[in-house]
Amino acid sequence: MENTLSALRSLMASHSPPLDALVVPSEDYHQSEYVSARDKRREFVSGFSGSAGLALITKDVALLWTDGRYFLQAEQQLSDEWKLMRIGEDPAVDTWMADNLLKEASIGVDPWCISIDTAQRWERSFAEKQQKLVQTTKNLVDEVWADRPPAEINAVVVQPLKFAGRSVADKLKDLRKKLVQEQARGIIFTSLDEVAWLYNIRGNDVAYCPVVHAFAIVTSNSAFLYVDKRKVSAEVKSHLEENGIEIREYTAVSFDVALLATDELDTTSTAKDTLAEITKQAEKFVSETNKSVNGKHQAKENSNNLIWADPGSCCYAVYSKLNPDTVLLQQSPLALAKALKNPVELEGLKQAHIRDGAAVVQYLVWLDKQMQDIFGASGYFSEGNTVKKEELSQSLKLTEVTVSDKLEGFRASKKHFRGLSFPTISSVGPNGAVIHYSPKAETCAELDPDKIYLFDSGAQYLDGTTDITRTVHFGKPSAHEKACYTAVLKGHIALGNAVFPNGTNGHALDILARIPLWKNGLDYRHGTGHGIGSYLNVHEGPHLISFKPRNVPLQSSMTVTDEPGYYEDGAFGIRLENVLIINEADTKFNFGDKGYLSFEHITWAPYQTKLIDLNLLTPDEINWLNSYHSRCRDILQPHLDDAAENEWLKKATEPVGV
């Protein structure tokens, strides 16, 4: 790590202009949350492997910013050369740079790895001291990363209409209506899931996310896909061409954005067809325009139409090639269109979650038996003390990794399975307090029947993406552990039962999940709910349920998770998570003619009643729990062929408090 920092500082000093600081974001050229191995630049320089964070390297310090989900993980992974900066507690990165760097300091960043919003916010922070945000002509981390993984050539595939629910033609038609409404003659898409959704394609370029590295440009009469053509089969080419989509090389996007800015994008010729020619043109253009953030191509004076770019997801390199006076900086219309699931997508999600729930039950049945047979645990249902066995003859060592591999195996046996939707969080005892803990085979813990076990996992199926968290104990939980679990469950129930008017933002509902914890002086450092894709990203916007405000109303046909938690450092973690669909509510009245909304659970797996202190639940909460368990049993039993599994599920969903 020390050698890496030294090498970067040497490049910073020799850069033109010399750099006083270098920013290394987590994101790739598409502002992705999850990135491919070759794009994990921040992880390479810092050693921190969390999905969110930003590294800043100056001449004499190295700092890492991350949010509350990763405080513990960052403390464990950062070496002595690095200082952890806690988002929400320490100064924001732009504030720190403005306050601590010298007047007229030059701060370098790869403009492809930073959003328009972020870059402009930083420029405002730097203005008082005349500090400059400098676009590096090359990514400096790539220059020192000797064994950087090579780019993979993964095939693009068509997402069939029977799963997508809407044709590309219909999606393009709706999109072009939006362009007319906003007086825009073109729009640029850089988010991988938006490109995949719009063109009904999927890929395998990013682990856990069925997307392909690609850009898209759509105008009033043309559509382009920028992708490594080696990934495109004859079938995919035919699918795209039938929908009027021209395929161009991935690296051509830089050149074509500049042509779009000056209204010279050639919408008829496909002569620029070779990778070598496109790369040469793109590199020439980048070298001319990336010298500073002020290098912009101006649109023609007689052009009154706008170019639409999403400031939150579009990279600054793209914006730097446009005339700022003719750019419409507004959220992508696809963000909301993708979040509003069509009937086929909703049905697919429901079916995927049923199969996924069956896999989770099979896993719990297997794990319960292993814990009893190997460790002498009292098991999932009983609260007796663990009877330690003198000799443990384990054919399979029960570690956080080996048991999560077993869970993946159960999922892999299900119809339409294509992989996991994120790295499984399989955590025992104190590891559960690391909110996004990712176990490694070399260092992970063994399961312990006397400690809480939390698993947060999900899968990618052709008809939907899943995400579920359950927390269990195979021994005798303490009264404190029960009280904490019950508080989390109460918040989970309260949010899932909410009825609210149209126009309500997720921020307004977040408190419902936290109140039972707050009453006990407890809380959690993460959001409560996120959207989920339809065989796409497991984290999907634009809506959220969070303590952080976001002005995006919840709407009917959106999906959102319900996942409160509680984490006690050095002891345990508790989280419960279901995926919900937002529906129109059938209310007795309709005050203000607003219309009201409610949630529908589509995740099916039992809550461990042994961990619940029933004295802390209200009669209504007990009724809800029993009703959910009854439906869970009815829905999952047809998908369990083994009699022992059915018997286990029946016992796990027996009514309580009656």
Curated annotation (Swiss-Prot):
Record text on cofactor binding: Binds 2 manganese or zinc ions per subunit.
Name the membrane topology term: Peripheral membrane protein
- What is the documented function of this protein? Catalyzes the removal of a penultimate prolyl residue from the N-termini of peptides, such as Arg-Pro-Pro. Aminopeptidase that binds to the auxin transport inhibitor N-1-naphthylphthalamic acid (NPA). May play a negative role in the regulation of PIN auxin transport proteins. Involved in the coordination of the symbiotic nodule developmental program; prevents the formation of root nodules by regulating the expression of the nuclear transcription factor Y subunit (NF-YA1), a key nodulin.
Tissue expression remark: Expressed at similar levels in shoot apical meristems (SAM), root meristems (RM), root apical meristems (RAM), roots and leaves and, to a slightly lesser degree, in root nodules.
Q: What induces it?
A: Induced rapidly after rhizobial inoculation with M.loti, peaking within a day and remaining at moderate levels during root nodule development.
What happens in the null mutant?
Increased root nodules number in the presence of M.loti probably due to a slight up-regulation of nodulins expression (e.g. NF-YA1).
Any Pfam family = Peptidase_M24_C
Official protein name in the record: Aminopeptidase P1
**Key words, A-Z:** Aminopeptidase, Cell membrane, Cytoplasm, Endoplasmic reticulum, Hydrolase, Manganese, Membrane, Metal-binding, Metalloprotease, Microsome, Nodulation, Nucleus, Protease, Zinc
Alphabetically, which GO biological process terms does the record hold?
A: nodulation; proteolysis; response to symbiotic bacterium
Could you give the subunit structure recorded for this chain?
Answer: Homodimer. Interacts with N-1-naphthylphthalamic acid (NPA). Interacts with NBCL/BOP2/COCH around the plasma membrane and in the nucleus; this interaction disturbs its regulation of the nuclear transcription factor Y subunit (NF-YA1).
Q: By which gene is this protein encoded?
A: APP1
Q: Which residues bind Mn(2+) 1?
A: D456, D467, E577
Q: Where is Mn(2+) 2 annotated to bind?
A: D467, H530, E563, E577
The highest taxon in the source lineage is Eukaryota
Instruction: Using the UniProt record, name the top-level EC class of this enzyme in a single word.
Output: hydrolase
Q: State any single GO MF term.
A: metalloaminopeptidase activity
Q: Which InterPro entries match?
A: Creatin/AminoP/Spt16_N, Creatinase/aminopeptidase-like, Creatinase_N, Pept_M24, Pept_M24B, Peptidase_M24_C, Peptidase_M24B_aminopep-P_CS, X-Pro_aminopeptidase_P
Q: What is its main location?
A: nucleus
Q: Which reaction does it catalyse?
A: Release of any N-terminal amino acid, including proline, that is linked to proline, even from a dipeptide or tripeptide
Location comes to: Nucleus; Cytoplasm; Cell membrane; Microsome membrane
User: Gene3D superfamilies, alphabetically?
Assistant: Creatinase/methionine aminopeptidase superfamily, Creatinase/prolidase N-terminal domain
Give the E.C. number(s): 3.4.11.9
